[in-house]
Amino acid sequence: MQDITNRILRQMNSTRLISTLFKPRQKATALYATQAEALQHKVFCRLMKDAAHTEWGLKYGYKDIKRYQRLQRVPIQTYEEIKPYVERMRHGEKDVLWRGEVQWFAKSSGTTNDKSKFIPVSREGLHDIHYAGGMDAVALYLQQNPESRFFSGKGLILGGSHAPNYNVKRSLVGDLSAILIENVNPLVNLIRVPDKKIALLSDFEEKVERITRATMNQNVTNLSGVPSWMMAVLKHILEVKGTDNLAEVWPDLEVFFSWRGCFYSLSRTI
C-alpha cells in the first residue's frame, strides 16, 4: 500500500494544487518588509494583554503597558531569577508567567552553569510561532520555486525525544523538536517520515538505524532538522545503500530546512 501511495504521489505534481493553500501566508510575509514596526507593535500589545492577569503580569502592571517605553520598567531577568516560577509551572500551577496551564517544556542544553534550562512552551507559542514559522518557511520556498515537486513525496523530519514532566498529567519535557512532532497536525503525519514512534526514540543510535530502514526506500523530497543530527542519519543511509551520492537514494530531494546550527558542514558532506 505504501509503494502504491509513493507511486501516485510521484506521478502527479500535487504541489501546484497544495501551493495555493500557502498564498495567504505568502501575502502576510510580504508585509514584513513594509509594515514591520506596526506588525511588531500589534504582537507586543497582544502579548501584554494575554499575560496581564498572570502573576507576573499583575506584578509588573502589564495591563497598563501599551508602549515599549513602559515595558522598560520591567527588569531584565536571568533564568536563575525566574527559575522558581518555571518550576511552579512545571508542577502544574496556572497563570504564573503565562495564562492558563503550560504543559510542555523545552529542555535546553547546558550553557553558562552547565545545567539544562526548561523553557515553557505554551499552546499559543506552538501554533503562533513554531508551526506558523514552519508554514512560512515552506510558503516562501514554494513562492521562490514555482516548479517545485515538494509534495510529490514525503519530508524526513528529524527530532529529539521527550519524557513525562514530573507526574503532571499530559505534561512533557524534552527537546523542542520532539514537542513539535508530538503535537503536530495529524495531516502532516501523512506527508512525513518516519512515524512518530521512531521519530521520538530516545536512543540515538537505534533511532538512526530505524530511520534509515524506514526512509531509504521512500520518495523523500525534503529534509528538516538539526544539521549535526541529520548528518549522522544521512551518512548511515549512504553507507547502507552503498553510495556516496544522496541523489541516488532520493532523486527528487530538493530542499533542507535547518532548525538550528550551521548548515555549511552538512552541505559539504552530502
Predicted regions and their residues:
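Nucleotide 5′-phosphate-binding alpha/beta core
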Residues: 1-107, 113-257, 264-268
